[in-house]
Amino acid sequence: MKKMLGMALLCGICLFGCQNETDKIVDEYENLGYTITYEVEENLIEKSNRMSVHLSIYVQIDEGTHNSYEREKQIFKDLMTDLSEHFYEEYGERYENQHYNGHHVSTVIYLNGSDEPFLLSNTEDDSTFIF
């Protein structure tokens, strides 16, 4: 019980840190004129006593911009690179680079140097990227 309580507390502290750092990084992008909405959710994986970070990010730029969809994807990729660098430095997590295959985004996240991926990315719906 104490172990789970400690992990839950650690999860809460880590989530607060992730949220604050994500706020700072997203602010930098918004200062460039991009509209970004996002949510950070951190879950404790009970069986392995590891935590996963789920980021849901929506990037939008002026619809009148030429190739706005491709630009949104690039901004998303840049933003995720910045976030992954922070998480690696702060928590020892490793992110494999995001892979774009047509309209699908794929990201593998590793925690604490593990060779086993514990979160495999997901879905893209228009310019909404979720994982």
Where are these regions (language model features)?
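Context-gated lysine
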Residues: 2-3, 7, 24, 46-47, ...
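Short, non-transmembrane amphipathic alpha-helical segments
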Residues: 67-97
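Phenylalanine-focused residue identity feature
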Residues: 16, 76, 87, 118, ...
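Polar/charged, Gly/Pro-rich intrinsically disordered segments
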Residues: 33-34, 40-64, 92-131
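Sec-dependent bacterial lipoprotein signal peptides
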Residues: 1-17
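Bacterial lipoprotein signal-peptidase II cleavage site
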Residues: 16-27
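Active-site metal-binding core of divalent-cation-utilizing nuclease and nuclease-like domains
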Residues: 29-31
